[in-house]
Amino acid sequence: MKELVILTGHSGAGKSTAAGLLEDLGFFCIDNLPPEVVYQVASILSNNVDKLAIVLDIRSYLFGNIQNAIKDVKERYPFTKVLFLTAAKDTLIQRFAHTRRSHPLSKQTNSIGEAIELEFEIMKEIMEIADLVIDTTMLNPHQLRTKLTTFLEEKSEKTFVVHVISFGFKYGMPLDADFVFDARFFPNPFYINELRPKTGKDEEVKEFLRKIDGVSEYLNKIYELINIAISRYETEGRKEITVAIGCTGGKHRSVYFAEELGQMFLNKDYKVTIEHRDVELG
């Protein structure tokens, strides 16, 4: 089966890392193409290349109409997937300061902040039509690889995808979550010596939380609410939802809720991914 990915996004958001991961997954990667040759390059799929990734950065946008180029490619290759990487603006500024690299738009602006603002404005229409937008603000390369693999495994006739994330509030909320739920008002297993080193995936912690009044009801209410949202999302043509559940450190309560909620959606034959973002930190 032929696969074509157009990888784009904001400068500093991790396109080079993502391109390297795509190469590890067997993709032939070509980057920094002007719009007028994107369609021609895509045609190499007709030869001996089965998996092609075309990487476009802001410089490609400045050469012409990227949106039309992507439209032309999608008309010929309907299986084309557009992947857009972004990150919080403050994070992008920090990344450029750390690497001491100049922003591609730095000559057209007075500061790195202005360059990033301009880039967001130029790229906003492509971001809106992307098949998947990944916020890399809190992602490490392993987590990015997991998201890429999940994205590529989804078939055109795929069912709705439910992404469930557990996290610790003290490490910040996931910026790409559609819904965020708080589990901090339930008793914390952290304060029980024998449960402290364990996680919400361990049976002892599960048993402790199951016995707490309100836990089961809260879980069911979250499930009911997300089901309502999914039905509306599907009506609007959306194909995925990201649900985040947090506790203090992201090790016990949120992990338990994420695992239980993920299983509930698996039982409905949705495609489900479960990520425990901070379980090693909590």
Swiss-Prot record:
Domain of life: Bacteria
InterPro entries attached to this UniProt entry: P-loop_NTPase, RapZ-like, RapZ-like_N, RapZ_C
Ranges in coiled-coil conformation: none
Transmembrane annotation, as ranges: none
The keyword Coiled coil belongs to this UniProt entry's keyword annotation: no
Any GO molecular function: GTP binding
Binding site for ATP: G9, H10, S11, G12, A13, G14, K15, S16
Keywords of the record: ATP-binding, GTP-binding, Nucleotide-binding
Binding residues annotated for GTP, in chain numbering: D57, I58, R59, S60
Pfam families in UniProt: PapZ_C, RapZ-like_N
Family: Belongs to the RapZ-like family.
Function: Displays ATPase and GTPase activities.
Protein name, as recorded: Nucleotide-binding protein Fnod_1159
Organism listed in the record: Fervidobacterium nodosum (strain ATCC 35602 / DSM 5306 / Rt17-B1)
Record lineage: Bacteria, Thermotogati, Thermotogota, Thermotogae, Thermotogales
